[in-house]
Amino acid sequence: MLKNKNRRFRICSDPAMRRLSLRFFAAAALLTLGVYASELFHLLEKPLFSRVYYGNLNATFFAIIAAIYIFLFVFLFHRSIKKRLKVSPFERHPAPMPLSRKALLYCLTVFPILLTAAFLGFHFKLIYELGERITGMTLLGNAVNYLFSGAKLFGAVYLIFLIERGCDALFVSRPPLPIGGFAALLTFGVCELIFTSSAFSLLYSILYLYYGILYLISGRRFGVTYSLALLLYIL
């Protein structure tokens, strides 16, 4: 976290740091393109999937393949980032998270879950999506879709990390704004509106900004942010 007491945006005068920030931003753009290249697997539905699978299995098979691709892409992407930029979002934090922040994160996670449940007739979103007539195929389809969405969420939190690190290099001081969350909203959030047909697409898009807020409050802890993002998405 930035410790400069000046909360105005002040760009770093060091050209090397500005160039470094551009590398972080370029990496974030590449990450977005790489993750949503998974949508190209839809092009295989007609020549391949429709001849082998029928009904809901088409979408299930697509989600499995796309999720595997995203996790593999992010794995290779992370290795490249660690080698070229010498950073990793998975570094351990020497100091434990203060109890006050844990309590705040708990409230910021539980409140939107309960609020969404209230709008859905006091049902968790997970129950609402499953419906009243639960079958094995319904459970399989939802589990696979959550796997696919979890893969995209992993990429989104990684993007938030890259944007925040890029801003650290670009600015010597800045307001405590979730710039990474705004970037995730404008990239992953917009892509979700374009590529998904869920009744919750708008909610999912707005949550990307929320993840950026959680990331900063957690002290930039990737694992904490990703875990809370999964809970918010599923429930």
Report residues per predicted region:
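Alpha-helical transmembrane segments in multi-pass membrane proteins
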Residues: 19-84, 105-106
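N-terminal juxtamembrane cytosolic/stromal segments of multi-pass membrane proteins
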Residues: 1-25, 83-97
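Aromatic-anchored segments of alpha-helical transmembrane domains
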Residues: 31-40, 112-120, 185-194, 229-235
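Residue-level signature of transmembrane alpha-helical entry/exit and packing/kink sites
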Residues: 19-27, 58-66, 102-107, 141, ...
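Acidic/proline-rich low-complexity IDRs
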Residues: 1, 19, 29-30, 107, ...
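Juxtamembrane helix-loop-helix connectors linking adjacent transmembrane helices
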Residues: 44-60, 81-173
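Alpha-helical transmembrane segments
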Residues: 31-35, 70-75, 114, 154-161, ...
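Transmembrane helix-loop-helix hairpins at the membrane interface
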Residues: 138-235
